[in-house]
């Protein structure tokens, strides 16, 4: 079940050898494609070990591994656009908790997933590691209940 040219319209970054890397926060770079299996509930997981942002107070770099897991509905995020989007945080000054919530909200706006969670495993600074977790389940569905359950159990994994 290969994808045809029409299904790939709007995917402009994958395979593009002249990729330009954004110098500032760039949610508009995110691209989506149709989920061919919207009737199946399944997780898609991204592990992004090279995330960098800036401390809004000191301007010093913060490093993290960002974990994104979602259950797609109609749309899915294209991975190269996600890579470039995450790269766009490199010169963006925000707290760890803000970065995780911004990433989640931007992906919700792009895909409208059934469920999504974003976890940031930030490298310790000043002897303290910060690991923010944000999630969302589509209102009025079983995924709203899943989100609540996962929120309270996320740290037991």
Swiss-Prot record:
One of its GO terms (biological process) is queuosine biosynthetic process. GO terms for molecular function: preQ1 synthase activity. It is found in: Cytoplasm. Keywords: Cytoplasm, NADP, Oxidoreductase, Queuosine biosynthesis. The active site is at 55 (thioimide intermediate), 62 (proton donor). Its EC number is 1.7.1.13. Its main location: cytoplasm. It is an enzyme of class 1 (oxidoreductase). Substrate binds at residues 77-79, 96-97. Pathway: tRNA modification; tRNA-queuosine biosynthesis. One of its GO terms (cellular component) is cytoplasm. It catalyses: 7-aminomethyl-7-carbaguanine + 2 NADP(+) = 7-cyano-7-deazaguanine + 2 NADPH + 3 H(+). Pfam families: QueF. Signal peptide: none annotated. Catalyzes the NADPH-dependent reduction of 7-cyano-7-deazaguanine (preQ0) to 7-aminomethyl-7-deazaguanine (preQ1). NCBIfam families: QueF-II. HAMAP family: QueF_type1. Belongs to the GTP cyclohydrolase I family. QueF type 1 subfamily. This is NADPH-dependent 7-cyano-7-deazaguanine reductase. It comes from Neisseria meningitidis serogroup C / serotype 2a (strain ATCC 700532 / DSM 15464 / FAM18). The gene is queF.
């Amino acid at each position: 079940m290969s994808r045809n040219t029409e299904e790939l319209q709007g995917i402009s970054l994958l395979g593009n050898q002249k990729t330009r890397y954004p110098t500032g926060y760039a949610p508009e770079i995110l691209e989506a494609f149709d989920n061919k299996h919207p009737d199946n509930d399944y997780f898609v997981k991204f592990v992004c070990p090279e995330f960098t942002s800036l401390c809004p107070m000191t301007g010093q770099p913060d490093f993290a591994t960002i974990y994104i897991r979602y259950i797609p509905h109609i749309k899915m995020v294209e991975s190269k656009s996600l890579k470039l989007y995450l790269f766009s945080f490199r010169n963006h000054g925000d707290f760890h908790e803000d970065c995780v919530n911004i990433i989640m909200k931007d992906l919700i706006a792009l895909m409208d997933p059934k469920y999504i969670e974003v976890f940031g495993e930030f490298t310790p600074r000043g002897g303290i590691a910060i690991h923010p977790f944000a999630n969302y389940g589509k209102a009025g569905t079983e995924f709203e209940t899943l989100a609540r359950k996962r929120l309270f159990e996320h740290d037991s994994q």
